[in-house]
Amino acid sequence: MGFLKKLFGNIEKANKGEISTEEIVPPFTVDLVEEADDYWRQMEENLLINAVKAVGGPEAVERAFVLTNFKKNQETFELFYQMDGQLLSWREMDASVVDKISNQLLPQAAEVARAVNENYEEANVPVIQYAMLQFETATMAWFGRKHTTASPEAKLTFEELVSGWRAILEKEVPNRPLDSDRPFPYYEV
């Protein structure tokens, strides 16, 4: 992605006469950190899409919140949904949703963590321990924050992160318009 961005930027510069045509094609370099981040952004979006599909699609929920735990041998997801102005855990939903999340989404956690973090390992940067993702159906906006092994939040247990963020979400949900198009606060230490 970085290469194409540079290429198109250079084409614009050449069209304006700012650089010569010989300088249009940038040197091709592989930025492993950028590639890892790009892959993570794709995975964030896929996780949110699957979380929303699991409950019946965007018409079934107002917002979806996904927490990931990518710590070795602890990989899992925690999901919350805003429905009719109320924040619900996926465990509080009807049996078909609980079954779908338990049997289809949660078993993917270890593979998702491995796929994402092997890219960061290859780039020789801190790997993701936790992430907090949010999706707003009214605007189709999504947001995410990752916590790597270098983040102070990595020292938290997953339960501490889940309960801390849920407390923030429960406080924010009643006061946030459905089309706010901005992220809820994240839990931080």
Where are these regions (language model features)?
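Extended intrinsically disordered, low-complexity coil regions enriched in Ser, Thr, Gly, Ala
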Residues: 57-59, 69-97, 143-163
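Acidic, proline/glycine-rich low-complexity IDRs
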Residues: 2-3, 137-189
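Surface-exposed polar/charged interaction patches
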Residues: 10, 14-17, 46, 50, ...
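N-terminal "first-domain core" detector
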Residues: 20-86
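Low-complexity, charge- and small-residue-enriched intrinsically disordered regions
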Residues: 2-23
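Amphipathic protein-protein interaction modules
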Residues: 103-153
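Negatively charged, low-complexity tracts enriched in Asp/Glu with abundant Ser/Thr
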Residues: 32-36, 89-107
